[in-house]
């Protein structure tokens, strides 16, 4: 098949880029040629059905390759996760021209924009999420106590672990910021008989959580509100405990202090706050492809910047735990469930969306496996609390 000079130039550039990733052997395929990278039997094949413009690769390797995969111009023959794990393990070899990507990378963190960003991801449809999440509808990192724990068991473990860390007592009040479909608050109400309030910006989650409260007869214990965290101080709220699981990533770097200010205003003196969030070793604007297609307003904070902001609100750290590998395993479960239900998903979305979602789950799993991002839980008190046990009680 005839190749243009431009295609040959782009092919050469792509090979020169990929031949740096020599840790594991793999093949690169083009229309009329094939290249063997590394020593030994290839473990996967990168198949370019169409070359990628050099200017796109220079601007952002991640965005160029991600969009090519979504279009079907690029395919992975073999295990997608293992291929991505190989490349992301050598993340320093990717390139990003941040000034050229400024529009994508730095979006507004206004209330209106953040509501739009949250609903664009979480309001895709409950029926879709039910296909690949577990029965609890937990869309956050599980906690695998045993190697063979199911995804469902890991999510139950995670919630139990968080509730133990919060040192709950019957009759206490608990706020869940970014409550999702409500499993954490439902478990807290059943096991500890607390009075809980959940807030979310997702209409789909709000509707499903309301239904769950009614179905399980928990109307006297739980309420859910469509509310932005910035509106919490406007209400006459005072909670014994506050928890936020997987929501901080949507807040934006400019608003971390504001977020913690809002928590401080509604948490009673001596109260406990557990913050569960994806983090990075250092401050970084984020991955261009993820920012454009998955979490438009998302930013991954560093652990150190959150600790610095906490001090401004007199939050005292009790414990910090990293659950990075638990998220890797959670994502691999999600990916398997997603692929197991691909025929049903084809009736809901087009091929581009499904390829995008598969890439998202696999890439995130590989990112956690390589320590590019972490998952931290910080347990803290508002001011000093000398009434808690002196050793870890969970």
Predicted regions and their residues:
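Conserved class I S-adenosyl-L-methionine
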Residues: 170-178
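Conserved SAM-binding strand-loop segment of SAM-dependent methyltransferases
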Residues: 217-230
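A short acidic, Gly/Pro-enriched loop at the edge of an enzyme's catalytic core
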Residues: 230-242
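Feature captures hydrophobic
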Residues: 1-155, 161
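Conserved SAM-binding loop of SAM-dependent methyltransferases across substrates and taxa
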Residues: 181-192
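Conserved beta-strand signature within the Rossmann-like core of class I S-adenosyl-L-methionine
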Residues: 270-278
């Amino acid at each position: 098949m005839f190749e243009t000079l431009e295609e040959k130039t782009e092919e050469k550039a792509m090979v020169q880029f990929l031949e740096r990733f020599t840790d594991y052997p793999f093949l690169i395929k083009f229309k009329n040629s094939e290249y063997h990278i590394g020593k030994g039997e290839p473990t996967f094949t990168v198949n370019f059905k169409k070359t990628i413009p050099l200017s796109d690769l220079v601007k952002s390797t991640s965005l160029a390759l991600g969009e090519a995969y979504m279009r079907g111009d690029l395919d992975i023959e073999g295990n997608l996760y293992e291929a991505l794990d190989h490349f992301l393990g050598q993340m320093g070899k990717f390139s990003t021209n941040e000034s050229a990507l400024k529009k994508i990378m730095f979006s507004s963190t206004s209330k209106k924009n953040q509501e739009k960003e949250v609903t664009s991801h979480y309001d895709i449809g409950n029926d879709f999420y039910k296909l690949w999440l577990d029965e609890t509808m937990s869309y956050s990192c599980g906690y695998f106590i045993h190697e063979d724990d199911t995804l469902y068991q890991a999510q139950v473990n995670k919630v139990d672990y968080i509730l133990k860390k919060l040192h709950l007592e019957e009759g206490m009040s608990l706020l869940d910021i970014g409550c999702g479909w409500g499993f954490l608050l439902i478990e807290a109400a059943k096991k500890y008989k607390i009075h809980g309030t959940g807030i979310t910006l997702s209409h789909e989650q709000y509707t499903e959580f309301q239904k769950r409260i009614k179905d399980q007869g928990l109307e006297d214990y739980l309420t859910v509100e469509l509310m932005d965290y910035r509106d919490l101080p406007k209400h006459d709220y005072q909670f014994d405990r506050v928890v936020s699981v997987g929501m901080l990533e949507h807040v934006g770097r400019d608003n971390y202090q504001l977020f913690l200010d809002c928590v401080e205003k509604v948490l009673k003196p001596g109260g406990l706050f557990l913050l569960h969030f994806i983090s990075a070793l250092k401050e970084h604007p984020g991955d261009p492809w993820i920012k454009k297609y998955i979490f438009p307003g998302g930013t991954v904070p560093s652990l150190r910047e959150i600790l610095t902001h906490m001090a401004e609100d007199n939050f005292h750290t009790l414990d910090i735990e990293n659950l990075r590998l638990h998220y890797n395993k959670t994502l691999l479960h999600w990916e398997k469930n997603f692929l197991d239900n691909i025929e049903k998903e084809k009736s809901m979305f087009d091929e581009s969306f499904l390829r995008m979602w598969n890439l998202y789950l696999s890439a995130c799993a590989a990112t956690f496996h390589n320590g590019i991002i972490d998952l931290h839980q910080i347990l803290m008190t508002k001011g000093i609390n000398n009434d808690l046990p002196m050793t870890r009680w969970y």
